[in-house]
Amino acid sequence: MRGVSVLKGRPRGQAALWLLCLGVPLSAPAIPIDQAVRAGLAIHPEVRSAMAEADRAGTEVEIAKGGYYPTVAMSGGPQEFDLGEVVYDLTVSQMLYDWGRVTSKVDSASATQRKLSEAVLVARDDAALDIVETYLDVLASERRVETVRQHIQRLDGIREMTQARGSDGYADRSELDRANLELARAQEQLSLEKGNLQDARNQYAILVGQDPSELVEPEPMSLQRYLASSDLARVIRESPLQRKAVEDANVAEAQVREAKASLLPQLNLEASALRREIGGRPESDSVMSLRFRMDTFQGLSNFRRPTAAQQRLESARWTADAMQRDIRRQLQTLFDNGDTLRWREQSLSQQVTEAEQVGELYREQFEVGRRDVIDLLNVQRERFEAERQLISLHIERKRIEYRAAAQVGLLGALLENRLNHGS
């Protein structure tokens, strides 16, 4: 009490500082799911790796654009039999026309950059969904632990009633032993649920970088209703998964153009300056000319490269079409599962309510000797199992909303409640 009086009259910030100095724990602020996701994404290695790959692709675009600039080749050194004399060969070449070969390389590098930028969004959504799933795992585990504890309290009440009934001579010891057995099973279940909770908390700490405390149950809006009022085809086309597949096809298309252009001669303007031995004497010379240059041919392989590139383009286009269909199929499956879970949740809620009513009725009948302990334990077990399943269904319905949002790149908007504003 003396320590508390010292804190009276001090500002709130100073009081908190005093509590820290005294070792008194302060209650941690509640962590909503969007804050947990932001904290986890800031330290997620896969997201950072994808971002580094996108940055590298941007550098590759600048490298490809270097094909528009002149190339310089230079060599030099002492003359073969006269070390005091230096010979050299300097050539500067500027591409004038290459049938779109350099442009195709730039287009391919740019499409690769866009593809990897979409890969960053995909990696971000995957990482965010992993954090969301773990967040919900912790919430579900905490609720299951609390449900088991309430179940144990009800079993303790039944055991006390059984003891009182046995001490009055209305029942033998078998009823008490049966109640103790059911209580031991509940204690074992509590240990299992605590272990699951600890595992979920450890996973959360690894992903988010801090221990879970005061988690807030999220209330995501129905993505099915949002998509029903939107252009689903457009949403799928604009999803990172679909755009990534489309950009892969764009890369393949640019590679087809590059392969075809490589079969044709490239027109260069070349200027050379050299010093070499002619007739036993070192001579300097300079030349400027127009030249056609082609890649080295090795059998028929050069002619087969456009065919291979065209085949890859066809494969990439089919993959993009398959991705669009797969996203639509995944959404439909998730929404169908959500409807089924909602119906089951309504049924289980009714079961829990009826189990509570039957339990109270059986308790009253047990007190007057019209029911034995087996009836009480059975109805309590049925209520407990229904409550556990109800927790799983309730959390699973929320998972479905987030999984569906991740499929179409709307997970961030769903977490931040921006879908209500027509995002």
Each language-model region and where it sits:
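Small/polar-residue-enriched beta-strand and adjacent coil segments characteristic
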Residues: 32, 71-123, 243-255, 260-323, ...
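Amphipathic alpha-helical coiled-coil segments
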Residues: 49-64, 123-152, 157-160, 164, ...
